[in-house]
Amino acid sequence: MSDIDRSRAQQLMREADIEALVLFQPEAFRYAVGAHAGVATMWGRAGSAIALVPADADAPIAAVVSDHAASLVRRAAPDIDLRCHRIWIDIVDLSGAETIAQVDDAYRRNNSGGPRPETFVRAACFGLLADLLRERGLSAARIGADLEFMPAADFLALRQALPDVDWVDGSPVLRRLRAVKSGREIELLRRAAAAAEAGLVAMAAAVRPGAALGGLSAAWKAGAQAHAAKSGFSLSGHWDYISVGPALSDMAAVVTPGALIKADVGTLVDGYSSDGARSFSWGPVSPLAADVFSALEAAFASGLEVIRPGNTFGAVHAAMLASMRRQGFSEYYRGHFGHSVGGGVGIEEWPFFSHDNPEIILPGMVVALEAPFYGEGLGALMIEDQFLVTTAGAECMNSLPRTLRDLSRA
C-alpha cells in the first residue's frame, strides 16, 4: 500500500498550484505505489516505472510498470490503476503446459510473444502516461515531476511527448510528503535502529588491543544481522563508517591503548535506513579528547531541547553551534547537525538541521540528531541518535548511553 497521506498531498499540491505529481525515481515510485518499481529501473533513467498521484485525494493513484513487474505490483497494490509496457525479459505463464507446442500456445494466450526491446522503450512508457493523463482530464494540466531525480535527456523527451502539460518541479512537494512518516515507515525505522544498536553492542564486545577495524566492522554487521533474525525480520542492507585511532582514513588501523573508536552505523529494513553513532576508547583518552567529547555532549543536549513541533530545523543548528561556541570552539562549524531518515536514495535525507533552515519540525517526522568531531591526529568522536517527533517533543529510538565509553573497563 502507498505510504502517501493523500489529504496532506492534496493540501501541498494545492499550495504549489499543481494538479498532480508524476514520479519517476524508483524510491519515489515505491513510496507512492507501495511496490517495487522493477528491474528496468537499474540504469537510473526515467520512464520504466511511473507513478501518477492526482491532487484530488479521492482520485486513485495510477502507475506505468513493466510487464515483468506487473504481477508483483498487482499483488502489493491491487487498487492501483496499472498500465504495462514490454521490457527485454521473456516470461510466460506455463501453468498446465507439458509440450513445446503448448508453450507456444501459452505465449499466444497470454499475449506475451513477439519481439522485445533491448531494455525498455521510453516512448512507449510516456505514451501510457499520456493515456492516463488524458483519461483523468490532465492532458494540459500543471503537473509536478520529481526533477531532482530526472535526467535532463529524459525530461526533454517527456516534454516533447506531452507538450501540452505544464511541467514544473514537484520535488519540494515530494520531499515534504516524505518527511512525515506513516506508521509503517516508523516501524521499519524502529527495527532498523534496534538492529544497528545491537550491532554496536556486538562490536564493543569485540574491541581489544590489536583488534583491526575490519574485524570490528564484521562484528557490528554480525550483531545487527543476528538481532534481525532473532526478532523475525530481515535486513535489506547495512552500512558502517568506523574509525579507529588518530588517523581518520586508516582502514588498516588496529586498537591501541588510548585509541578513540567512532562507529557511525545503520541498517536498512525494507529499504528504510537507520542512522546512529557512538564513541568508545580502549583505556583513558587524552585531556583534549575528553574536552571535545564533553562539548559534543553539551551541544547534543542543546539541540535535543529544540526538537519540538513548531520549531525550525535551523533553530536546532543554531542551538548546537552556540553551545560549541560557549565551550570555546570559536572556529568549529558543522554544515548540518543531522537530518531526516527514511527510504530514499541516501542515508541522509532532507530536511537537515542546517543554518537558517526555515523548515518546520512536524509530528511524525523521524530524524537523526548528530554531534560529530573529526580531528586528524586525535581521532573521531560522535554522538548520534534517531528520534520520532511527537506532539510532546522527541521520542528516542535508541537505548545505549551517549557517553564516551572506555571498553577496557567493561
Where are these regions (language model features)?
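Active-site neighborhoods and metal-handling regions in enzymes and metal-associated proteins
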Residues: M1-A410
